[in-house]
Each structure stands twice: as C-alpha cells, then as structure tokens.
C-alpha cells in the first residue's frame, strides 16, 4: 500500500510539473487551481490505475538506460586498469577479442556457484580473455584470503597455479581465511617462504586497492560482478546470460 501511495504521489508531482512547465503563467497557479489539477489527476488514476504501473515501468527503463551509460563512461575511463593492469590475473587468451572481467570474493556463495560458468567459457571460447579481480567485501576472512591469492599470483604469473589455488579455495568447505588459503597454497606446491615475503609487500595492498577503486567507479558493491566489453553484469546470472553478453560484445548480438 505504501508503495502504491508513493507511486501515486510521484505521478501527481510529475503531472503537476508538466502542467506548470507548459503554462506561460506557471508561477501564477493559485492554490485552488492546483487543488483542481490534483482532483483531476486523482480521479483519472482511480479510473485508470494501470497508468501507475506503466509509469513505473517507464521509469525503470530510463533508470536502467542511464545506469548503462554511466557504466560505459566508467569502463572507458578506467579501461587500462580494468583490462590491462599488470597486477591482474589473466586466464585464457591474453590477446582475445573479448575481455571478461570478474570481481569475486572467496566467501561468496554465488561466486562458488558461478565459477563453473567462468571455467566453461574459458574452455569453450579460445578467443576469450578472462581477468579475475580480488574484491573481498565479506569480512576479514575474505581480505586475508585475497591477500594470499595476490601473493600466489606474484609467484606464478602464468596463471596456472593461481587457477588451481582459486578453484580449491573457492570450492572448499568453511570460511575462506588466511589459514585455509595458506593450506591450499602449500597443498599445490608453492614456495611458502616466498609467499610469506610477498604477502608483506606493498604490491598486495596496491592490488586490492586498485580493485576497490574500480568497483567504486562502476558502482559495484557485491559479488560476483562482471565487466564484459562495455557492459556491467551484476550477480550470478548463469552461463547462457554470460555467453550472450560475450557474443554481444564480440559481434553485436546475443548469438554469433
């Protein structure tokens, strides 16, 4: 009911504004004239309540379009850091004609479910460049796990060991934190002395700060979130939806 009343009030305000804007004597509306307009609006909306839904649908469309434009502007402004940062993890084809960027958190349940989508795209699309951005937003354990992950990447720039680490930690049971991340790193045969040294380096902090800066510029506050071409996709939308975005970026339509 409150939502309907808010919609009704918004509709009245919009119509009054339009009426005022179209009148050469807009500033001369008397209180009685405004009351009459409000009465007419109220009676019309009661007789045609579907107008409220139409108005809200149109508002949603405009807001979605405006948000998409903001995303495109931000992606263009930060394209180097998004797609070509020397700090980022790159999987797949480094010279691919479409870049697929994922922001994730090791304690994100939706990220765990979405990992197979990313791996399938990686396996099936030889022209896809995949970039992984650590975005630990779910507490101290997530930050610790991300710090270890950055150090893992510093030790293995090929991405092979990082991907092994990524899969094991993301699919493991319990909270991802420093202890679990270090256990995974040891299990896959990394140099633990070097890992400890790298974790203390300024590069780890700078890498995470870069991810948070990009996320802020794009208006991202949850995981998983994706940048595919000049589009932002929020949430675990599923393999087919991600494929469509990749295809749209590559050839201008959902299927190539």
What spans do the regions from the language model cover?
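Extracytoplasmic/secreted proteins, especially bacterial periplasmic and envelope-associated proteins
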Residues: 36, 40, 47-54, 113, ...
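Structural alpha/beta surface segment adjacent to cysteine/selenocysteine redox centers
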Residues: 101, 112-186, 196, 216-221, ...
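The canonical Cys-X-X-Cys-His
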Residues: 108-112, 225-227
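A short beta-strand-turn-helix
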Residues: 80-98
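Short pre-active-site segment immediately N-terminal to redox-active cysteine/selenocysteine motifs
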Residues: 104-107, 222
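Solvent-exposed coil/turn segments that connect beta secondary-structure elements
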Residues: 105-106, 135-136, 231, 238
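C-terminal cap of thioredoxin/glutaredoxin-like
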Residues: 4-8, 26-42, 62, 183-256
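N-terminal targeting signals for export/organelle localization
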Residues: 2-4, 13-80
